Amino acid sequence: HVAYHTEHLKILLAHRPGFTAPTQAARKVATLDNLIDGRLWLHIITGGVDADQRRDGDFLSHDERYARTDEYLQVMKGVWSQEEPFNYEGDYYRCSKASSEVQSIQRPHVPLWFGGVSEAAIPVGAKHADTYALFGEPRSQVTELMALLQHQAAANDRKLSFNLSFRPILGDTEGAAWDKARSILAGVEASSPKSRGINASGKGPEAETARRLTRLIEGGEIQDECLWVPIAA
């Protein structure tokens, strides 16, 4: 619908490996890229919380999921780039004479976005991603993380682009914006006073990104000039 009513806007589509064969997913993505005139970006979401994955029947561990994503993207890229049918055999996927008659408009393939900053995630993202998606953290931490990711990418003869996600809170004046922020916090605390930062097992966050944000909250309400973090995690 969005693509039909726009001409230049890029479409960022979230896609979770593990529930569709990578060969089939590669053909679907290439087809969609053709239908919307080469405006598709694909954000690979591996999944950082066991309970969320298990609701959909995925019982692999956190690190196993990232290992599977690595294979998934190897196969997808093979479908997009190989001129001849190819075979693949890994721990999670096997295919024989995989190919696609449809190729994406964007070459060599639809740009890949990736998220995750755990020890299992970073090597996979640095190997495959075109754009690495990060959450808003203090400048020093973002700079350190970007340097680590670029170092990992360089080991694969690659260079990453980055997306940094913030949720701006706006007001007619700075004071009004701060009043609005604290009103939002009061609403969050009223609706979930005991559950914030706690997962289904009753423990702290499983995902490394969530753990980083939780530690950030413990460091103070405002960081840098106006990075406000009480509801970051």
Name each model feature, range by range.
Residues 2, 32, 42, 76, ...:
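Conserved, mostly hydrophobic/aromatic
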Residues 5-8, 36, 126-132:
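Glycine-enriched alpha-helix->loop->beta-strand junction motifs that scaffold or abut catalytic
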Residues 11-15, 40-44, 112-115, 130-134, ...:
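Hydrophobic faces of well-ordered beta-strands that scaffold small-molecule active sites
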Residues 17-34:
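Glycine-rich anion/phosphate-binding loops
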Residues 18, 40-54:
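Substrate-binding cleft and catalytic face of glycoside hydrolase catalytic domains
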Residues 25-28, 114-124:
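Short, acidic/polar
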Residues 48, 56, 62-106, 137-233:
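An alpha-helical appendage that flanks or caps ligand/catalytic pockets
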Residues 118, 124-133, 137-141:
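Long hydrophobic segments that form regular secondary structure
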